[in-house]
Curated annotation (Swiss-Prot):
<keyword id="KW-0472">Membrane</keyword>
<keyword id="KW-0479">Metal-binding</keyword>
<dbReference type="GO" id="GO:0005886">
    <property type="term" value="C:plasma membrane"/>
</dbReference>
<feature type="binding site">
    <location>
        <position position="462"/>
    </location>
    <ligand>
        <name>Zn(2+)</name>
    </ligand>
</feature>
<dbReference type="InterPro" id="IPR018752">
    <property type="entry name" value="DabA"/>
</dbReference>
<feature type="binding site">
    <location>
        <position position="460"/>
    </location>
    <ligand>
        <name>Zn(2+)</name>
    </ligand>
</feature>
<comment type="function">
    <text>Part of an energy-coupled inorganic carbon pump.</text>
</comment>
<keyword id="KW-0813">Transport</keyword>
<keyword id="KW-0862">Zinc</keyword>
<feature type="binding site">
    <location>
        <position position="734"/>
    </location>
    <ligand>
        <name>Zn(2+)</name>
    </ligand>
</feature>
<comment type="similarity">
    <text>Belongs to the inorganic carbon transporter (TC 9.A.2) DabA family.</text>
</comment>
<protein>
    <recommendedName>
        <fullName>Probable inorganic carbon transporter subunit DabA 2</fullName>
    </recommendedName>
</protein>
<keyword id="KW-1003">Cell membrane</keyword>
<comment type="subunit">
    <text>Forms a complex with DabB.</text>
</comment>
<dbReference type="GO" id="GO:0008270">
    <property type="term" value="F:zinc ion binding"/>
</dbReference>
<feature type="binding site">
    <location>
        <position position="719"/>
    </location>
    <ligand>
        <name>Zn(2+)</name>
    </ligand>
</feature>
<dbReference type="Pfam" id="PF10070">
    <property type="entry name" value="DabA"/>
</dbReference>
Amino acid sequence: MVDALNLGRRLRVRSTAYVASELVPFFWPMRNFISRNPLRRLESMPFEQAVRRGAALFHARMFLPRGDYQRWRREGKVRPETLDEEIGRRSQDLPPVPGVDWPRWLHALMQTPHDRDAVVRGVRAKDVHAALRGHPPSAQAVDVAALLPELEQRLHARTLPEAVDALWGTGLADELDDLVIKSYLDFFDEDQSAWRMPGRERGLFSAWSEVTRRNARMVLRRLHVRHILDHVQDAESAVVYVMEEMGIGAEAWPTYFTRVLTRLHGWTGFVRWRASAKHYYWAQQYPADIVDLLAIRLVMGLALLQESARHRGTPMRRDDLGAVVRERGAECVLRYALHSGEVLPDWAQRIDDTLSRGNGARCHDLLQRYWPLWQARLGQQQAAALRELAAAANATAALDALAPEDVEGLLQGLRDFAPQEGMVWTLAMEGQAIDKLLTQVQAPQDPPPDKRPFAQALFCIDVRAEPIRRHLERVGNYQTFGIAGFFGVPVGFLGYGKGSESHYCPAVITPKNLVLELPAALDPHNEDFVSTLGHVLHDLKKSVLSPYVTVEAVGMLFGLDLFGKTLAPLGYSRWRRRIDTEKPVTRLLVDKLSREQADSIIRTLQRAMIVKALHTELKIERERVDSGIIRELREIALRRRDGPTRLRTTFGVPQTQETEFIDKLRQVYGVDADYTNHQLERLGRIGYSLDEQVNYVHTALTMIGLTQTFSRFVLVVGHGGKTENNPYESALDCGACGGASGIVNARVFAQMANKAAVRERLAAMGITIPEDTWFMPALHVTTTDAIELFDLDLLPPRHLVYLERLRNSLRAASRLTAAERMPKLLPEAKALEPAEALRLANRLAVDWAQVRPEWGLSGNVYGIVGRRALTENSDLQGSAFLLSYDWRCDPRGRLLENLLTGPVVVGQWINLEYFFSTVDNSRLGSGSKVYHNVSGRFGVMTGSLSDLRTGLPMQTVMREGRPYHEPMRLIALIEAPLDFAGRVLERVVKVKSLVLGGWIRAIVIDPTQGYKPFVFNNGQWEERTPLIAPAEKEYSA
């Protein structure tokens, strides 16, 4: 066994592993899908540099194939001027080549109809020159030593199992993936599987080690994992032992760890998040961190290397591998060619036969004959590509005149431009999108201050709100606003019947306050309320099914679900809702508890625990105990008085047993002074103080510019999706609410805003809300386009006469939105009437066979921070996050700071989640839903074993194999004076970095300069033509 690690070495292992893993972004559980930029940990770099680093890190492509951009160019979605500007600018950095007009050649390259690389990998300029001249292949002897540095570099960039695979085709890395994924599933399972790894409470590595030592499957597989584990004590020592056994020095650990942890980046991201989520129940019960993950993979990798060394003679140390390459160079070159697929088809069998004989001289002879033919073939392929390119550039004569050294310059220039081409296309698409936006926005006009809209509505900034806002405004006298869907109120929520707290706020925020959902029949001032709340706080159990429902009955019901939701989804859904138990009308406990209420709750809870303890420990039933004995036991347990108790005189309990019972009350049942203080702290989280409520409502209303002319109805509209058989259902919910429905936050905010005490304080702060204004929570169901109203039983009677008019308008907006949305899902739906389109939307939402009930946020490209009047006359086709903001209400820029650091940054995460899920759906997205399996109730895998799929499914961003989402970076438009916006950006370091680094494209529309737009491009603000003023709008009562 190795010596125990000292503190310094232990910290070095942990710190190196943590730094290596930080390149992988967090991955949240699927039930709360959180959009994130897959390259978020590279945001300190300029975007164009980051995508190159990301391509190498995740082995993914960062831009689409050329053909997709060419199609969009034909459709007018690519700005030609930007193409010319970018090609011209980048041509200046390419090596000068006689007779080569780089802009002309690059334009020709971007117009070629295929997507293959412009330069063939591994080609030599002299072979290309010979092929262009029609000369035969070189007869010069192959210098094997000259081929080895590149081979060694390629092998060094891999982990040791991957390097062995590259030379021997052993498949160790794939087998290693399967082995560790099985272990991860057994440990991280959240009660989905019938079997879970024992001993999980000790931590991942400890539990895995114990199970693996007894795993017969490992013995049958001839993996001596137990022998390795006998040499280590914990995860840190395992890492050190394996790295030493593989001959990898500490200076190489950071790069090696990064390669190990990014191979299954979904699992790495999940473990990183889980280890940081202190509130997460499963992490509290069964801890795991990135060092555990790393150690398991290293130990299993070493076991596979040892097994391969015993049976195949492959090396198991990095230095041994290097020695093999140097000593058996010709053999290794041939091995790499064969197993990488970079081999002439006619020679593959011949190479394989020679390698199987293991004769070094034969390998050397074969390489001397094969390698010139291989290089000649590459030269011929490259020459053909250059001739095609030269013909397109009308430069055939220039190509024919190139000397060998000029051919090398041409190839180098094409190599240099290759990773830039996707960026050029993206910039040109963004340029066209910016031009399009600036033709749609108009100089805003404020509505007359004395004209009161029939209703106002606060919607989430989500792009799916744009169509229904537009239609609602056009069916009647409605005014809409955009605000982050948690309405600025972070909510910790304990729902009715739920067993754990959920967070309804952006993922980067941890709520301080807890809101309870309780049946409306409970009165906060009576004993039933106190008793129920005490039970909720003590024993947070989730009742899924009543105990008397048999497994067989559940199975039959599920069978009915599968049948009904697939063959007759809409009718079945209605029937199922009728037989399901109705959730009672509920209220949210939003106000802080008084000290008297908190004391009463704890007192009731402690009395209940004493009764339970009497029954469990002393077999004394409740009916034999009066309240005096319970009160006496409680006082003694809390050390407020001394014994003895009536347990001795009434029940004959011996003194020693009585003492033991009192100790158990304190230590086991929580009837203790210290635990009472802890419970008081927990109860202190419940609800919001009046000051907090005033602050939240004031900030939200001021931020969106709703400070006067309040309507009779102010709808607070959260949003969420309702689908069936969809592991990605939470991806359709509100990102600002932590991947959950926004109705909880809407109800909380409305309850605050309707409170008389809050309004009284707001009036003193300059915001007077009329007595007849009622804030009403609602839910925009994005999969059905419906807007559902909540808490109608609280609606003042005088508002009931207007309710039907409101509902009619909402229904009309829903039908019009469905008629706009359905043809995007199903082209054959173009001819549907609005009412038919709405019925179709409802059917798709409950159809188990439907893999795409909506497009989600596909098409998002704009983030508009300003008054709604900028865009209210524009059809933005669901492409814009609309954030209401009035700079005139924000003299110090604090509100704009909050918008930039919150919603704009979250919008950028969402935007880049869609961007990268589109450009490489297999690596950065999650592939097709058809092959998805829910794993452990926290993630999705492709098939039975794979990396956790972290991005968006193919059906969300692709249609019929082509991109539906058009990948562009977020274009953020701010309505504010340029100098004012500039000062705010300077203060918000994170957003300033994103703008300067090109992660966000910025536009400022300056109302003090005649609404002149300024576009940030290449490090400076470029002026554009001022906006036009809209036609005069009529306002009806």
